[in-house]
Amino acid sequence: MLTLKILVYTVVSFFVSLFIFGFLSNDPGRNPNSKDFE
C-alpha cells in the first residue's frame, strides 16, 4: 500500500512539474531560440 502511494505521488509530481515546465517555456517558445531545444 505504501509503495502504491509513493508511486502515485511520484507520477503526480512528474506531471505537475512537466506541466509547469511546459507553461513556463510556452512564452519564449515563440522565439526562434526554441528550435534549439527540439
UniProtKB/Swiss-Prot annotation:
Pfam families documented for this protein: PsbI
Keyword Transmembrane: yes
Transmembrane segments: 4-24
Membrane topology according to the record: Single-pass membrane protein
A GO biological process held by the record: photosynthesis
Primary subcellular site in the record, as a coarse category: plastid
GO cellular component: chloroplast thylakoid membrane; photosystem II reaction center
UniProtKB keywords: Chloroplast, Membrane, Photosynthesis, Photosystem II, Plastid, Reaction center, Thylakoid, Transmembrane, Transmembrane helix
Domain of life of the native organism: Eukaryota
Subcellular location: Plastid, Chloroplast thylakoid membrane
NCBIfam families, per database record: PRK02655.1
Self-association and partners: PSII is composed of 1 copy each of membrane proteins PsbA, PsbB, PsbC, PsbD, PsbE, PsbF, PsbH, PsbI, PsbJ, PsbK, PsbL, PsbM, PsbT, PsbX, PsbY, PsbZ, Psb30/Ycf12, at least 3 peripheral proteins of the oxygen-evolving complex and a large number of cofactors. It forms dimeric complexes.
Summary of the function given for this chain in its UniProt record: One of the components of the core complex of photosystem II (PSII), required for its stability and/or assembly. PSII is a light-driven water:plastoquinone oxidoreductase that uses light energy to abstract electrons from H(2)O, generating O(2) and a proton gradient subsequently used for ATP formation. It consists of a core antenna complex that captures photons, and an electron transfer chain that converts photonic excitation into a charge separation.
UniProt similarity note: Belongs to the PsbI family.
Name this protein carries in UniProt: Photosystem II reaction center protein I
Organism in which the protein naturally occurs: Ostreococcus tauri
Gene behind this protein: psbI
